[in-house]
């Protein structure tokens, strides 16, 4: 009885969510033999064009909190997974997030102020700026509540990114004509 309960809890652990995401991205990486074929190919699958917005730093290693630019008519709320992005952009983002999980997030210097990227995205070191969590009046209950809130959010984002990696892999297989391979 105890083993069944432990197995259920392990299935929903953060470690397993990270492993599922890393496994999906590894599968995507092994399937996509020629990533350049993904350039300029729109990802028409609506399952990939929704609500996860993350920005990769200019050097490809740092996740940044962002102040989104004004969305144009072709974007879905200005998110990274907007329809205007091609499959290659999705591929690079998913691999970058996998590397951040496996190797850690390195703080990258912000892009130059005059650059296009610098005007659209406001860099902020989200790992170091924890001052708002360390308020003098914050009790232990608040920390526990914040921890559980962020843990649920991280688990949700990892699940969505895993699904997105699987969708991209299947879409690539359709594009090059071997949609039934590996099933």
Curated annotation (Swiss-Prot):
The modification Phosphoserine is found at residues 75, 79. It is found in: Nucleus; Cytoplasm; Cytoplasm, Cytoskeleton. Keywords: Acetylation, Cytoplasm, Cytoskeleton, Lipid biosynthesis, Lipid metabolism, Microtubule, Nucleus, Phosphoprotein. Its main location: nucleus. Gene3D superfamilies: 6.10.140.1610. One of its GO terms (molecular function) is identical protein binding. The modification N-acetylmethionine is found at residue 1. Belongs to the SPOT14 family. Plays a role in the regulation of lipogenesis in liver. Up-regulates ACACA enzyme activity. Required for efficient lipid biosynthesis, including triacylglycerol, diacylglycerol and phospholipid. Involved in stabilization of microtubules. Homodimer in the absence of THRSP. Heterodimer with THRSP. The homodimer interacts with ACACA and ACACB. Promotes polymerization of Acetyl-CoA carboxylase to form complexes that contain MID1IP1 and ACACA and/or ACACB. Interaction with THRSP interferes with ACACA binding. This is Mid1-interacting protein 1. The gene is MID1IP1.
